[in-house]
Curated annotation (Swiss-Prot):
It holds the Pfam family Ribosomal_S15. The gene is rpsO. Keywords: Ribonucleoprotein, Ribosomal protein, RNA-binding, rRNA-binding. GO terms for cellular component: cytosolic small ribosomal subunit. It comes from Geobacter sulfurreducens (strain ATCC 51573 / DSM 12127 / PCA). SMART domains: Ribosomal_S15. HAMAP family: Ribosomal_uS15_B (MF_01343_B). This is Small ribosomal subunit protein uS15. One of its GO terms (biological process) is translation. Belongs to the universal ribosomal protein uS15 family. One of the primary rRNA binding proteins, it binds directly to 16S rRNA where it helps nucleate assembly of the platform of the 30S subunit by binding and bridging several RNA helices of the 16S rRNA.
Length: 88
């Protein structure tokens, strides 16, 4: 689960300006961290299908944000993909 300190750290590394918490880059980074956490969770709890559905929803949400960012600004899209190591 994302602890407050970890969440603040992610926001500070990906923010565009001082009070930025909702830019697509920040949202994508937070969702990516949750996806990584849940992926590790499923290595131990293979039969947790309820949470697996939540993971699929999070992946879909991140995909929509990435598509939006790609449509609006390709350079920002490429930089966030490279920073987070997301395959596309």
């Amino acid at each position: 689960m994302l602890v407050t300190d970890k969440k603040k750290e992610i926001i500070t590394t990906h923010k565009l300006h001082d009070s930025d918490t909702g830019s697509p880059e920040v949202q994508i980074a937070l969702l990516t961290e949750r996806i990584i956490y849940l992926t590790e969770h499923f290595k131990v709890h293979k039969k947790d299908h309820h949470s697996r559905r939540g993971l699929l929803k999070i992946v879909g949400q991140r995909r929509r944000l990435l598509d939006y960012l790609k449509k609006k600004d390709v350079e920002r899209y490429r930089s966030i993909i490279e920073k987070l190591g997301i395959r596309r």
